[in-house]
Curated annotation (Swiss-Prot):
InterPro entries: CRR_secretory_protein, GNK2, GNK2_sf. This is Putative cysteine-rich repeat secretory protein 16. Residues 1-30 form the signal peptide. GO terms for cellular component: extracellular region. It is found in: Secreted. Keywords: Repeat, Secreted, Signal.
């Protein structure tokens, strides 16, 4: 069930489009070492498009436009064409510490892996550094309650109060993110260790929806992350992660929240 609208990501079969994106990848090889593929979902209920169709042509046009634009500086870009049944949109959101060339490279990497969903109108793909979403619907300002997932460390925390501690920390991070481009990273003391955390909402999501999105995935996947030494939960509109080691770029490592 959608909070407002679906997530997405689709397939193009023309390698020329991928090559166009690769022109902008100055550090793809080195980035891929730290830009792990995380997951993807092909949304069959959004239908498929035919080779040479209007949808495919407009999709390719959008991808080329985003790849040659300046949205990577901000770390976010969204472009759409058409209306009603001919509507197609592409949204790229990079992690807050992955702007510029890293964001551009992640976008190109995601486009190059688009064959995971051959000719699907709707799908989404997650990488460590970015999330690419392609949709036949308008998703601006909306998040999807269905297409999300959790990854966690098998090792457990030896502290009963971890859940309460993390939720307080996460709430503090969300508060900071709402004042700073919907992204925040920081650390807090947890016994004898430091707990590092990060939270982000897609830039077109409004403040109240951002907090609701994070709260939704935190509760939905509580059995996955609770008590684990590290975890990340990702959706189409927001995501969070925590570890016992720093994992974001030093320029965006954030503040101590003790």
């Amino acid at each position: 069930m959608y909070y407002s609208s679906p997530t997405c990501f689709v397939l193009i079969t023309i390698f020329a489009v991928v090559v166009t994106q690769l022109i902008f990848m100055r550090t793809v090889s080195s980035l891929n070492m730290t830009n792990a593929y995380l997951n993807h979902k092909c949304l069959a209920n959004q239908g498929k498009y035919k080779p040479g169709s209007w949808y495919e042509k407009k999709l390719q046009s959008i991808i080329v436009s985003i790849g040659s634009g300046d949205g990577f500086t901000l770390g976010y870009d969204m472009m759409a064409l058409g209306k009603d049944s001919d509507y197609v949109a592409v949204t790229n959101q990079c992690r807050g510490d992955s702007n510029g060339s890293m964001c551009r490279s992640c976008f190109a990497t995601a486009i190059a892996r688009v064959t995971r969903c051959p000719r699907y109108k709707g799908a989404i793909i997650w990488y460590d550094q970015c999330t690419l979403q392609i949709s036949p619907f308008d998703t601006q300002g909306k998040f999807d309650k269905d297409n999300d997932f959790c990854m966690s460390n098998k090792k457990k925390m030896n502290v009963d109060s971890f859940g309460e501690k993390w939720m307080t920390f996460l709430d503090n991070l969300v508060g900071i993110a709402l004042k700073d481009h919907l992204y925040a990273a920081g650390d807090t003391r947890f016994g004898t260790k430091k707990l590092y955390g990060m939270v982000q909402c897609r830039l077109d999501i409004y403040n109240n929806s951002c907090r609701e999105c994070v709260g939704h995935i935190a509760v939905k996947f509580q059995d996955c992350w609770h008590g684990k030494q590290g975890a990340r939960v990702l959706g189409s509109g927001c995501n969070f992660r925590y570890e016992l080691y720093p994992f974001v770029g030093s320029n965006k490592r954030g503040r101590n929240l003790n």
